UniProtKB/Swiss-Prot annotation:
Region (A): 1-338
Family, similarity comment: Belongs to the heat shock protein 90 family.
Native organism taxonomy: Bacteria, Pseudomonadati, Pseudomonadota, Alphaproteobacteria, Rickettsiales
Protein name from the UniProt record: Chaperone protein HtpG
Organism: Wolbachia sp. subsp. Brugia malayi (strain TRS)
Domain of life (superkingdom): Bacteria
């Protein structure tokens, strides 16, 4: 390989960087980049831009390509000299280009070129180029003590060399002998950065950041043998119908790091006010770390096929973190280091557009094939419902809620809330639901007895996240949600007329006794309960716990206590089923014999029973066991 020291130069001109570049370089070198790998990404990206420019210019002037051959980028190293070389046969730079592009940190050759294209009448020839802030090149000084740039612009005869140690000055010289058109960058590496001279280190950086750029990136070893480093095609740039299922499967396995095929593919190109392409996959398998607190979204961000990051990406909301794939856009705003996204209007627009599209496609899947959608929901439904807890417009929340599926007392299959509403009784007025730890526990809950007996459907929520979203979402399409654990639930209006008259007659006959027994229950239980009421929803169980309207849900309160977010337990309402044989026996015994220790034990045991069923802690488990044993002993005797 021809080294710079073999060239003769003349007319060396020493210049100072504009815009106090010495200070800016200090920021770039020591503060701006957190990952030193970035320097090679930037140099390869710049080289790709140069090739793109030449390809575009050659459409207007074919002679520019005559001596260039295949457009490509080569990387090589010389460990003896401690030097790294990045070469391209792209458009190259003239003396003025070197001053304008490398001597002024606020300037950008690519941006100037893009501006020229935008002003051109021949807009159909527009080429995809990455907009830069003019600092990517200077990241080389993180690892190099000196940077040397040799370049000849396509179509021109003169060759130039630019060099700097990053101390605020640079020099430009004219080369006596002509070099091929394009640009060669030589980095004289700092001794502690010689790891970047290793072929495997270079290959890792290229495959990580530049695997999908338009041009071949080759490594040339010391014997002159070349090896192509970037191998993958950017299939998201193809037309949707041109990508085969096999290509999707291979690409999915590469970005998702899981086996199998994707459950759903979303491949779209948005050409509106904001331009972007997305190729997103929903996996068929739930990742083991889906609910790990440190797990982040793993959608890769590209800018015109150059990988930027997959950390801190705000393009996909956290509740869609199961998505895998890429988002590529020339309009994405980047901060000055290109390592993190700026939180601004463009990012938010892409996020909203993508989120809306994903929810829409999932909705179509749910309608087309419920069995297949159930597989998705089993894997990712709990994550999707996390989005219901986020602040969002009502329309967006209802769209998300519409694709949610739940267990129900009215159907063996998962149902949507729209399905539920379509089956509501005319006088119902509420979407009834019950939360619990498992499907079996909620199905056997006493809270459901009255609803089932009257043919009222109840949605069954069994994921921990259900406790949270039901506390912030109170209605859907004008229908209010109501937990069946609320003490003010009244099911009498759903009773058949004859049965209703019969129940009222029974209540009138027992009214005097029930008032006194409620007072007795309240006296025995004291501060352990907020109040004691006659239940209007129990049919088979003697008692249950309930909470007043507006109070915290039973399960939510328990969760907060378990997480040490709540250090007290609020007294609950005890509902009593006066039609149950046990309660009738207590009423009769109290009426005939008044207060007695056995009756008091029975009241305590009924309360403990209600606590156990709802998963509530008992203040004194030993007392419960003692009272139970006393009562059992009397029964056995």
């Amino acid at each position: 390989m021809m080294e710079l020291k073999m060239h003769n130069v003349k007319g060396t001109e020493n210049l100072k960087f504009d815009a106090e570049v010495g200070k800016v370089l200090n920021i770039v070198i020591h503060s701006l980049y957190t990952n030193k790998d970035i320097f090679l990404r930037e140099l390869v990206s710049n080289a790709s831009d140069a090739c793109d420019k030449l390809r575009y210019e050659s459409q207007l002037n074919p002679n520019l390509l005559d001596s260039s051959g295949e457009l490509k980028i080569t990387i090589s190293s010389n460990k003896d000299e401690n030097e790294l070389y990045v070469t391209d046969n792209g458009i190259g730079m003239s003396r003025q280009d070197l001053i304008g592009n490398l001597g002024t940190i606020a300037s950008s050759g690519t941006q100037k070129f893009l501006d020229a294209i935008k002003n051109s009448k021949d807009s159909s020839q527009a080429v995809e180029l990455i907009g830069k802030f003019g600092v990517g090149f200077y990241s080389s000084f993180m690892v190099a003590s000196e940077v040397i740039v040799e370049s000849r612009k396509a179509g021109e005869e003169e060759s130039w060399v630019w060099r700097s140690t990053g101390d605020g000055e640079y020099s430009i010289s004219k080369l006596d002998n002509q070099i091929p058109c394009g640009t060669k960058i030589t980095l004289v590496m700092r001794p502690e950065e010689n790891e970047f001279l290793d072929k495997f280190r270079i290959e890792n950086i290229v495959t990580t950041y530049s695997d999908h750029i338009n041009f071949p990136v080759e490594f040339i070893d010391e014997e002159g043998k070349s090896e192509k480093l970037n191998s993958k095609a950017a299939i998201w740039t193809k037309l949707k119908n041109d990508v085969t299922q096999e290509e999707h499967n291979d690409f999915f396995r590469g970005v998702a790091h899981v086996g199998g095929e994707p459950w759903m593919i979303l491949h779209n190109k948005n050409e509106g006010a904001i331009e972007y392409t997305n190729l997103l996959y929903v996996p068929s398998i739930k990742p083991f770390d889906l609910f790990h607190p440190d797990r982040r979204c793993s959608v890769k961000l590209y800018v015109n096929k150059v990988f930027i990051t997959e950390d801190n990406v705000q393009i996909i909301p956290q509740y869609l973190r199961f998505l895998k794939g890429v988002v590529d856009s020339p309009d994405l705003p980047l901060n000055i280091s290109r390592e993190t996204l700026q939180n601004n209007r463009v990012v938010e627009q892409i996020r909203k557009s993508l989120t809306k599209r994903v929810i829409s496609e999932l909705g179509k899947k749910a309608k087309e094939n419920l069995e297949e959608y159930t597989k998705f929901w089993t894997n990712f439904g709990a994550v999707l419902k996390e989005g219901l807890c986020e602040a969002m417009p009502t329309e967006e929340r209802e769209a998300l809620l519409s694709i949610c599926r739940f267990h129900s007392t009215g159907d063996k299959k998962l149902v949507s809330i729209d399905d539920y509403i379509s089956r509501m009784k005319p006088e119902q007025g509420y979407i009834y639901y019950l939360t619990g730890n498992s499907l079996d526990s909620v199905k056997n809950s006493p809270q459901l007895e009255g609803f089932i007996s009257k043919g009222l459907e109840v949605l069954l929520f069994v994921d921990p996240v259900d406790d949270f979203w039901t506390s912030v979402i109170h209605e859907y399409k004008g229908q209010k949600f109501k937990s069946v654990t609320r003490a003010d639930v009244d099911l009498e209006k759903f009773s058949p007329e004859e049965k209703d008259k019969e129940n009222k007659s029974d209540e009138e006959r027992a009214e005097g006794n029930t008032d006194s027994i409620l007072q007795y229950f309240t006296k025995v239980l004291g501060n352990a309960v907020k109040s004691v009421k006659i239940s209007k929803k129990l049919t088979d169980s003697p008692v249950c716990l309930a909470v007043d309207e507006g109070a915290m849900d039973l399960r939510m309160e328990r969760f907060l206590r378990e997480q040490n977010q709540l250090n007290y337990r609020t007294p609950k309402v005890l509902e009593v089923n006066t039609k149950h044989s046990v309660i009738k026996s207590i009423i009769k015994s109290y009426a005939e014999n008044g207060e007695n220790p056995t009756l008091e034990d029975m009241v305590h045991l009924l309360f403990y029973q209600a606590c156990i069923v709802e998963g509530e802690e008992m203040d004194d488990a030993s007392l419960f066991a003692k009272k139970l044993n006393n009562l059992l002993g009397k029964v056995i005797i």
